[in-house]
């Protein structure tokens, strides 16, 4: 029904493009006028546009002229002129949307249009790429356009100094990777001096390969961490223990029909990527480690280590999920097959794999600052993205990032032939058929690009081709420069290139001489990915800019996708046909089944990401509060009134804790109150007896008076340095407590799923307890700040310095040291919400 309506009124993208076309016509109509301008006159347009913006015109008002200026500048500097479809793409990006443009349609050039226009406001534009090589390449390649028009261009790559970074961020347009932009944001929010800040306000970002960054890497946390003091011995013991256990593999989604676990020690569900000890496994663990009850909270760390060891053995496969190289465990990116140097699996899984592989176990690390890409990129005032494949994830872009996806038509018609899948019963038969196909195609001289899902599979296929004497290149994407070079040659006559799925993304495959007559590039997929988008990316390597090309996927019933998500009906159908292993099966039912399996996995992964975002949003809200307050302190806000206000709030809170609701002094814990305040500011100024003879209000007034008197005395002692002392202390205290809070919230998140057993919504419970913990953290910050300021030794006045001098980055990092979460005083339903919104708790974060 939907398709019939679309035929009548056009798709959403077609309708939106129709609205844009008059603007495109206007840009094109300006071409003759701009061609007549001298270089100086064209350059002067930038100053004119800036002046018009100052006088009240909007970016939309000057868009046609600004785009016309960029178009002409591109021709004069690079001999490249934006096509009509590229102008459409540029407008879509300026509107804060995602432009889906096929491979080879010139996305890099398209970005110069909205980047120039938005840079005219003087607030900076970030163009985000997936690796350092592309960031440098694009900045150097497109730089002359911006420079010609009088704008500066910077590039942020790994290894730059703070000064170099600051200079790059102060440019009008800054190219860089998602990792570098994110880490700089975190580092800025750990800075102790204002002069250490490198980033400006996050204004406008254009993300290249937006699906890779906002979908595939959405759950990847950027973590700045420092080493934690923790023994690695338990990882070895847990590893020795799980080697003795017997697994039961069970891949059903039905929780009600659990299998008989008699004789098995743990269950592995590859589909859900989970492991769990059985009753027998729990008994063995209790005996092996000498504990009476593994489920006891005091054994939570032990249980966590056992589960990570089970995951390392049952779910994590060498040469698929990771490789062991030079005595180190290195992660393999599941989407690109790249080795991810410097990254580590989180929550102790990396150490568990190190124990399994018998290499040196690195110490766990402590999280100092963290943010996910999802939350980092949502900080920008305006966000846009480009990719060849976004339509399948349109719902996710809209729901999570409020980003529309607009399909941009190709400059020339697409003539690539996409053949139906060939399905085999066994993996062995499938790979033999692939080798035959490569051999036959190679005889004609037609280039072949073979996409594999893992390093292990690409090396296996390489061995098979060597035996047949076929010269080929294997691309496991260890070096981006080499990768781009190999991929660029993949379109030459007779070339055979094996590459893990999306290696070389961002580099065009240009057809060599005479290749178009042979049918163009042939793309062979050795397995269907669980995401249709990744398959489409591989297909998109052929048939760029109207070139000929063809693609085909080879599938076996032993592939992970079919094994875990294919239906039993399909397996029965294949068995009933009784065909030999080496005969391919072609049936519409099979093609439909593969697509249904992919859609099922995509929907499941989206739900997981959405669910995790609900948890992450809680910490994100708190992070925004802490970082914004921290920035005010850093930028020199006078803290005197804030400190005096802290004294009022602290005394009020302490009196509530030690006197409760009772109006009778006999029910109050005066001794406890005075003892507690002794560590903060009291020094015998108030006796227990005198305190007992006061009302609550009198007691509060007296204590506040004593504290403020101490504060004023310290102010006189220190003189001008008091403001600096306040800043030093507050920044130190906030950073230390924020680190502890990240740890505590992480641990709460791990244990909260158990609440579902008690018929409670884990999200609601998590939200409530996390804000309760946040409220307690704020109180601890107030207490420690007052205590340290009032007891500061003025002679040894501290200089502002980093809370942790040596930091190292892991993305994603290992889990921090866990601290047990202490249950704290509850927030009342009618109390102000601890998130700082000003609303009552029941109307804000406590709303169910």
Swiss-Prot record:
Monomer and homodimer. Part of the essential Sec protein translocation apparatus which comprises SecA, SecYEG and auxiliary proteins SecDF. Other proteins may also be involved. May bind 1 zinc ion per subunit. The gene is secA. It comes from Caldicellulosiruptor saccharolyticus (strain ATCC 43494 / DSM 8903 / Tp8T 6331). Keywords: ATP-binding, Cell membrane, Cytoplasm, Membrane, Metal-binding, Nucleotide-binding, Protein transport, Translocase, Translocation, Transport, Zinc. Its EC number is 7.4.2.8. This is Protein translocase subunit SecA. Part of the Sec protein translocase complex. Interacts with the SecYEG preprotein conducting channel. Has a central role in coupling the hydrolysis of ATP to the transfer of proteins into and across the cell membrane, serving as an ATP-driven molecular motor driving the stepwise translocation of polypeptide chains across the membrane. One of its GO terms (biological process) is protein import. ATP binds at residues 86, 104-108, 508. The lineage of its organism: Bacteria, Bacillati, Bacillota, Bacillota incertae sedis, Caldicellulosiruptorales. Belongs to the SecA family.
